[in-house]
């Protein structure tokens, strides 16, 4: 038997913080690829520390629903799961964006744990960001390949340089594809700042995609106000919104995109999980849902 455990931060203050985790778990559960699918959180129940005791399978794939390699993925989660012999070097990620997986024993439950790198640094996240950009303009009769820029927004922090590396990594990969005329990485807490997003683009239209797992205070309040979409998030704002001679198409957190379930699956597959055609089925289902939503908006 094999199980999948999706671990995420959660929040005592924002009940919507855990919604993407449960949604993606449900999507994967429906494929039947795993005998068990569980969710666990740092700030909600079920907690990291208890989740392995709820699993019957001997082989457990743990996928962190986090954006970057850092304190939570390298220290907190392995500690709370009681992974014997864990060392960050097991991930073989010297550049901060290349974590793969490590297979270890969980000391008190006699299970083999395949501990995966965070979803946010997986190559497939570039596809999710692009898909998110498509979603905000869907049904609006626009062509993203014509005079559109893409801003990928990260939190950023001087305390963990890896926080920014994931943002730059995906911005660079998307830029190389030539899908958008311009692609820039911007941040909340370091330069270049999202407050000045219009200064970094020549394109008239800019799609702004926050590389956050869930919608919350940052994505719903801080970023819209920082960019000048509105003076007060409670009054709402237009999409697109006119700011400094540009049209800003703001998408909200990328982690709510249905295709994120694909990234979770791919992390597990990279660690050795046998999922049959589940990856292809999830991709097909999420894109079909997108097509239906776009048609409904026409």
Which residues does each PLM region occupy?
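Extended amphipathic ligand-handling, pore-lining, and cofactor/metal-binding catalytic surfaces
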Residues: 1-298
């Amino acid at each position: 038997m094999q199980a999948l455990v999706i671990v995420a931060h959660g929040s005592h203050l924002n009940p919507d913080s855990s919604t993407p985790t449960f949604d993606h778990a449900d999507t994967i559960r429906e494929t039947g690829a795993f005998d068990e699918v569980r969710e666990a959180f740092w700030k909600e129940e079920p907690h990291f520390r208890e989740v392995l005791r709820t699993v019957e399978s001997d082989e457990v794939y743990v996928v962190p629903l986090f954006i970057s390699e850092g304190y939570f993925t390298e220290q907190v989660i392995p500690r709370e799961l009681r992974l014997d012999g864990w060392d960050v070097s097991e991930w073989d990620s010297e550049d901060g964006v290349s974590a793969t997986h490590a297979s270890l024993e969980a000391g008190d439950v006699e299970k083999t744990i395949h501990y995966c790198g965070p979803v946010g640094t997986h190559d497939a996240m570039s596809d999710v960001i692009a898909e998110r950009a498509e979603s905000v303009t869907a049904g609006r009769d626009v062509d993203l390949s014509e005079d559109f820029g893409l801003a990928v927004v990260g939190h950023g922090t001087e305390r963990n340089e890896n926080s920014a590396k994931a943002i730059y990594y995906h911005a660079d990969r998307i830029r190389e594809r030539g899908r958008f005329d311009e692609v820039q990485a911007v941040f909340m807490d370091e330069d270049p700042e999202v407050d000045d997003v219009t200064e970094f683009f020549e394109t008239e239209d800019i799609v702004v995609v926050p590389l956050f797992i869930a919608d919350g205070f940052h994505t719903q309040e801080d970023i819209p106000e920082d960019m000048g979409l509105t003076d007060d998030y409670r009054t709402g704002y237009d999409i697109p919104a006119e700011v400094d001679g540009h049209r800003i198409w703001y998408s909200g957190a990328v982690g709510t995109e249905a295709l994120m379930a694909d990234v979770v699956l791919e992390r597990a597959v990279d660690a050795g999980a046998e999922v049959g055609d589940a990856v292809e089925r999830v991709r097909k289902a999420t894109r079909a849902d997108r097509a239906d939503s776009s048609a409904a908006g026409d």
